[in-house]
């Protein structure tokens, strides 16, 4: 199927979270504009949902208007909002794998993943991966490293290290890792965002980007060298820059994406600037994957108050990237 007709798949995520309800709300907002299919157990959808069960993504085109196409994957148990059931953990994992298989074979244009709850997956299925992104990388065969971008109209930002303790960042952060992160980001901005000459800024690790060695040595010992070498190859790069002055409005006008050194250095600014509209994008995979930039929100699941905006933006961005993907 071509990207124009192939659907974006929405994986169910943790069925006891807000994933099912925001997926339905997003489909309702976008139906008629982007072909979509939800993948999971229909018992986990809001009770009022009108849906049509299908067995292959190509059948989305045959589903009547006003009915959610559902690629049915039977789970072990029903779900109770706010209370994850360990019996359903393997089902969550298997749905992600099924979606990846369909996207990789070209039956679907892209994957938009609803939030998972890692502890529930560990408790119920001995999940071995630090997070969603790392599992997707494994499903892709580990051919390249998956890089997490957080994107909105206000900012695109990429953390070089992701789901590790802050005390481990200096050890895990290496010249090779930073070089690969910048290179993958640069390629994705060209291929999937249509930016032919991306402008990228790189944060320092330490306060004030080390302040000449007074507050840390990584910037002068090797971060600056990595940036200089890649700039010499033709990339438009600046850095290392103090992270505390990289994200104000005027600074953001000067770049297309920012590279951060660790998780919170990247996620705090985007969630402050555009909390409801942020999208998690996985770069470096052989397929397109986006996700809303929030978690399962067990405390409000099933109450009808979850905001679907980030899911809507994630689906729209997935479709946009699929149309540009080369």
From Swiss-Prot:
<dbReference type="Pfam" id="PF04166">
    <property type="entry name" value="PdxA"/>
</dbReference>
<feature type="binding site">
    <location>
        <position position="280"/>
    </location>
    <ligand>
        <name>substrate</name>
    </ligand>
</feature>
<keyword id="KW-0520">NAD</keyword>
<keyword id="KW-0460">Magnesium</keyword>
<comment type="similarity">
    <text>Belongs to the PdxA family.</text>
</comment>
<feature type="binding site">
    <location>
        <position position="208"/>
    </location>
    <ligand>
        <name>a divalent metal cation</name>
    </ligand>
</feature>
<keyword id="KW-0862">Zinc</keyword>
<feature type="binding site">
    <location>
        <position position="289"/>
    </location>
    <ligand>
        <name>substrate</name>
    </ligand>
</feature>
<comment type="pathway">
    <text>Cofactor biosynthesis; pyridoxine 5'-phosphate biosynthesis; pyridoxine 5'-phosphate from D-erythrose 4-phosphate: step 4/5.</text>
</comment>
<feature type="binding site">
    <location>
        <position position="263"/>
    </location>
    <ligand>
        <name>a divalent metal cation</name>
    </ligand>
</feature>
<protein>
    <recommendedName>
        <fullName>4-hydroxythreonine-4-phosphate dehydrogenase</fullName>
        <ecNumber>1.1.1.262</ecNumber>
    </recommendedName>
</protein>
<keyword id="KW-0560">Oxidoreductase</keyword>
<dbReference type="InterPro" id="IPR037510">
    <property type="entry name" value="PdxA"/>
</dbReference>
<dbReference type="GO" id="GO:0008270">
    <property type="term" value="F:zinc ion binding"/>
</dbReference>
<dbReference type="GO" id="GO:0051287">
    <property type="term" value="F:NAD binding"/>
</dbReference>
<dbReference type="GO" id="GO:0050570">
    <property type="term" value="F:4-hydroxythreonine-4-phosphate dehydrogenase activity"/>
</dbReference>
<dbReference type="GO" id="GO:0005737">
    <property type="term" value="C:cytoplasm"/>
</dbReference>
<comment type="subunit">
    <text>Homodimer.</text>
</comment>
<keyword id="KW-0479">Metal-binding</keyword>
<feature type="binding site">
    <location>
        <position position="271"/>
    </location>
    <ligand>
        <name>substrate</name>
    </ligand>
</feature>
<dbReference type="GO" id="GO:0000287">
    <property type="term" value="F:magnesium ion binding"/>
</dbReference>
<dbReference type="GO" id="GO:0050897">
    <property type="term" value="F:cobalt ion binding"/>
</dbReference>
<feature type="binding site">
    <location>
        <position position="163"/>
    </location>
    <ligand>
        <name>a divalent metal cation</name>
    </ligand>
</feature>
<dbReference type="InterPro" id="IPR005255">
    <property type="entry name" value="PdxA_fam"/>
</dbReference>
<dbReference type="GO" id="GO:0042823">
    <property type="term" value="P:pyridoxal phosphate biosynthetic process"/>
</dbReference>
<keyword id="KW-0664">Pyridoxine biosynthesis</keyword>
<keyword id="KW-0170">Cobalt</keyword>
<keyword id="KW-0963">Cytoplasm</keyword>
<comment type="function">
    <text>Catalyzes the NAD(P)-dependent oxidation of 4-(phosphooxy)-L-threonine (HTP) into 2-amino-3-oxo-4-(phosphooxy)butyric acid which spontaneously decarboxylates to form 3-amino-2-oxopropyl phosphate (AHAP).</text>
</comment>
<feature type="binding site">
    <location>
        <position position="132"/>
    </location>
    <ligand>
        <name>substrate</name>
    </ligand>
</feature>
<feature type="binding site">
    <location>
        <position position="133"/>
    </location>
    <ligand>
        <name>substrate</name>
    </ligand>
</feature>
<keyword id="KW-0521">NADP</keyword>
<dbReference type="GO" id="GO:0008615">
    <property type="term" value="P:pyridoxine biosynthetic process"/>
</dbReference>
